């Protein structure tokens, strides 16, 4: 009986410990397919989900989001293990995968739904974001136009958007190349 109790205690304790290490962060950086590819490569990232956030319509659909009828941005939900990576590191990955100076969207995707947004869930995150923006502005002597918004709700995008870069590899590469994403990023970040 003691063994069973110890095993159950260990399972419950380790599950709670694991759950407390699991965190989420939300970034909008233009096309969520490209953002998903970038963050899936980061050590400590457990899962990425393409979706929508920041708007006023509940359960939005892609066709409405890209018509700018919902107030939502194409957003990536990133689930990560905070014992391996942290908010600051993920924010660094975010910056080098967007053009923080483009007020009209990202790369070849223009419009409200493609603008860059960093969502925060608490004041600590907000301060980290604001400091990082100041550092970028000082480095480049340019104004960062990425929005900083309080996170409210996330809606998962349609299934065909999830892992698009893996499921539609050739089509995705053509899109990415056509948007000159890597060229623009190299020009900005080196």
Please identify what each model-predicted range represents.
Residues 4-13:
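Sec-dependent N-terminal signal peptides
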Residues 18-190:
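Flexible coil/turn and secondary-structure edge motifs
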